[in-house]
């Protein structure tokens, strides 16, 4: 158990209610949470670095980007990779049977 899980459970016991603290403990406790999985983080880092390498290798060949559009295009590429890796991790880790195993 992590310290955040224990802290939330202590707060839940102090209030003597079963409010939204159970939902937070669900997200912080289980290891197949897609936001904390090692596979998603490694995919995300690989995608970010490959986009940076691809962009900087093709930057001189394209020659269209000005200096102010350079940072914007890097940011957009990073956001696309982030969304792709997040969607890939969510579709892989949050299958229909995982909700049956760990009900809220």
UniProtKB/Swiss-Prot annotation:
It comes from the Eukaryota. GO terms for cellular component: membrane. The chain crosses the membrane at residues 45-65, 70-90. Keywords: Membrane, Transmembrane, Transmembrane helix. It is found in: Membrane. It is a multi-pass membrane protein. This is Uncharacterized protein YDR029W. It comes from Saccharomyces cerevisiae (strain ATCC 204508 / S288c) (Baker's yeast).
């Amino acid at each position: 158990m992590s310290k955040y899980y224990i802290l939330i459970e202590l707060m839940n016991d102090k209030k003597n209610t079963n409010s939204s603290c159970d939902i937070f403990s669900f997200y912080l406790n289980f290891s197949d949470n897609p936001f904390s999985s090692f596979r998603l983080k490694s995919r995300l880092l690989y995608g970010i670095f490959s986009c940076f390498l691809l962009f900087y290798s093709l930057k001189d060949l394209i020659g269209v980007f000005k200096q102010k559009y350079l940072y914007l295009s890097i940011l957009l590429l990073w956001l696309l990779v982030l969304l792709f890796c997040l969607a890939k991790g969510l579709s892989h880790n949050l299958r229909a049977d995982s909700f049956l195993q760990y009900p809220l």
